[in-house]
């Protein structure tokens, strides 16, 4: 069976095998440590993320699978400079969330789309980042200004501006734009759900930081005129990331170009 490279994250790499995505942890240099992390992480996802009532039906389906480290996996692990000190590897296995024959088009720093040649199915991938916040400024908009990113829209505000900004000149079907806009304006949209989830766990920093870094997929079908939402990247964050977050928050708090919050947070 042939492995097909799918993508890479900061601490993982994904391959397609027999129609499913195998997600391999690269967080540690030793396979045995990655195996322990994957098992703990899978438990965290089930107990802390999938258990949230507003997200239970949109967290990507996944299973934990122990695979024998044969030649094809040995080559992958060696390419990633992982020390192979175990005969088996723990993988999180998930469905592929876009059509296999689709092409990917980067829209900006946080957005990309996958589409087939006939535009009958389009999948929009995006990271909405921090939605709920207790500050009087919008963390996303302020962080974009701090980083010098020319991003005027916000996932918390004005869905029409989001659609106009991201899809202007992209030659996507009008039906797609209409259906996606209607979805984003609904109270059941994935951004509204994530806002509610982040607010719900605001006193649980570990879970909150996970929810602030998820990736969303919205898959649209021309045949059914439906939009299906899925979230991935729901991993537990390492404790040492907290120092980075704290230093970023200090920089944002003193940044003169802070952007006013779009919601009246309580």
Curated annotation (Swiss-Prot):
Its EC number is 2.7.1.158. Keywords: ATP-binding, Kinase, Nucleotide-binding, Nucleus, Transferase. It catalyses: 1D-myo-inositol 1,3,4,5,6-pentakisphosphate + ATP = 1D-myo-inositol hexakisphosphate + ADP + H(+). InterPro entries: Ins_P5_2-kin. Its main location: nucleus. It is found in: Nucleus. It is an enzyme of class 2 (transferase). A motif (EXKPK motif) lies at residues 125-129. One of its GO terms (biological process) is inositol phosphate biosynthetic process. Coiled coil: none annotated. The keyword Calcium does not apply. One of its GO terms (molecular function) is ATP binding. Transmembrane segments: none annotated. GO terms for cellular component: nucleus. The EXKPK motif is conserved in inositol-pentakisphosphate 2-kinases of both family 1 and 2. Belongs to the IPK1 type 1 family. Has kinase activity and phosphorylates inositol-1,3,4,5,6-pentakisphosphate (Ins(1,3,4,5,6)P5) to produce 1,2,3,4,5,6-hexakisphosphate (InsP6), also known as phytate. This is Inositol-pentakisphosphate 2-kinase.
């Amino acid at each position: 069976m042939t492995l097909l490279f799918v993508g890479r994250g900061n601490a993982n790499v994904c391959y397609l095998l027999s129609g499913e995505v195998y997600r391999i942890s690269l967080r540690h240099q030793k396979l045995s440590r990655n195996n322990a992390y994957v098992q703990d992480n899978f438990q965290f996802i089930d107990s802390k993320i999938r258990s949230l009532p507003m997200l239970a039906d949109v967290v990507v389906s996944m299973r934990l699978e122990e695979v024998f480290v044969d030649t094809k996996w040995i080559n992958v692990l060696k390419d990633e400079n992982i020390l192979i000190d175990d005969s088996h590897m723990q993988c999180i296995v998930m469905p592929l969330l876009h059509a296999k024959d689709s092409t990917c088009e980067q829209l900006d720093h946080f957005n990309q789309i996958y589409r087939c040649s006939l535009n009958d199915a389009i999948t929009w991938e995006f990271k909405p980042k921090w939605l709920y916040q207790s500050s009087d400024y919008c963390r996303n908009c302020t962080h974009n200004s701090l980083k010098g990113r020319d991003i005027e829209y916000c996932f918390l505000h004005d869905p029409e501006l989001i659609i106009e900004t991201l899809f202007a000149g992209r030659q996507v079907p009008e039906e797609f734009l209409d259906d996606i806009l209607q979805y984003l304006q609904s109270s059941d949209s994935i951004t509204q759900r994530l806002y509610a989830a982040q607010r719900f766990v605001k006193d649980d920093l570990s879970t909150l930081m996970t929810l602030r870094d998820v990736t969303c997929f919205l898959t649209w079908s021309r045949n059914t005129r439906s939009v299906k939402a899925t979230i991935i990247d729901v991993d537990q964050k390492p404790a040492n990331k907290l120092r980075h977050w704290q230093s970023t928050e200090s920089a944002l708090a003193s940044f003169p170009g802070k952007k006013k919050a779009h919601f009246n947070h309580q």
